[in-house]
């Protein structure tokens, strides 16, 4: 669940910048404007460039630390692609044990083929490495989704309702004891889904974030995550879907969601962005 949640949470809140048409006749300008409108706005966000990275810290029942880095960003008239590295540590606070360390590498493709079309995002054959106290997991994951993955260029007036989004995901992992190259079990979830409900825009206000005092606005929605049929070591395990109420605090000047609040079963977890930077030395 943590893998799918991490992947799904991050793209929202990116602010795109309009691509200006080049010189030439009216027809050329119109064509350039049409291409710019059709491109996924996320690709033109000021932070969407090679070497950019974001650091997030979460509290609550599952404390976590997440660092995401973009590499090898390439743009096209209808979108972009990039390598996304996700390094995370997470743990159940009640267990008081060492964290689970997870490393993911995704080749992400973002497209919008027409101005009226939904933005799509896809990653195939992502490499997953995870390590816990007694075991490690290695394998592949994939996800595909359509909908609103960023808040750029949208009508964010108070009271506005934005459309949601749908993700389908799959993961196939082998489980190894630490220090051994012989797999002792497997885990497969081929029909996992994440449904994001309609988003409701709140009032722009000042917010004390871990990056300082910022102007931000709350955007709230319900999120339902289902692993679908889960196979562990050849045994079918049914996992109940989880439903969460989420509030993104989107800060336009930073073009990013600097805080996310997740409420589930009367418990609230907060995930804060602590750094949003570009490494000019990165490829």
Language-model regions, residue ranges each:
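Bacterial N-terminal signal peptides
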Residues: 1-8
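Acidic, serine/threonine-rich low-complexity disordered tracts
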Residues: 16-133, 176-283
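Surface-exposed acidic loop/strand-edge motifs in secreted or periplasmic proteins
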Residues: 126-179, 186-189
């Amino acid at each position: 669940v943590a893998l799918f949640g991490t992947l799904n949470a991050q793209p929202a809140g990116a602010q795109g910048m309009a691509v200006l048409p080049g010189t030439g006749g009216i027809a050329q300008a119109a064509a350039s404007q049409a291409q710019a409108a059709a491109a996924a706005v996320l690709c033109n966000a000021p932070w969407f460039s090679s070497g950019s990275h974001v650091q997030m810290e979460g509290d609550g029942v599952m404390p976590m630390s997440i660092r995401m880095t973009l590499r090898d960003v390439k743009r096209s008239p209808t979108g972009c692609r990039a390598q996304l590295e996700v390094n995370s540590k997470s743990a159940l606070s009640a267990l008081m044990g060492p964290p689970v360390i997870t490393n993911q590498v995704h080749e992400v493709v973002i497209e919008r083929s027409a101005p009226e079309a939904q933005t799509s995002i896809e990653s195939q054959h992502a490499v997953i490495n995870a390590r816990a106290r007694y075991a490690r997991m290695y394998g592949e994951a994939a996800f595909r989704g359509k909908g609103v993955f960023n808040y750029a260029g949208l009508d964010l007036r108070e009271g506005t309702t934005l459309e949601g989004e749908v993700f389908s995901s799959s993961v196939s992992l082998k489980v190894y004891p630490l220090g051994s190259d012989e797999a002792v079990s497997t885990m497969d979830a081929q029909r996992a889904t994440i449904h994001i409900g309609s988003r409701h825009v709140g009032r722009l206000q000042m917010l004390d974030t871990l990056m300082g005092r910022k102007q931000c606005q709350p955007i709230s929605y319900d999120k339902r995550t289902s692993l679908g049929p889960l196979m562990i070591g050849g045994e079918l395990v049914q996992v109940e879907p989880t439903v969460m109420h989420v509030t993104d605090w989107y800060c336009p000047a930073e073009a990013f969601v600097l805080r996310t609040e997740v409420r589930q079963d009367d418990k609230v977890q907060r995930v804060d962005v602590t750094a949003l930077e570009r490494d000019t030395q990165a490829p």
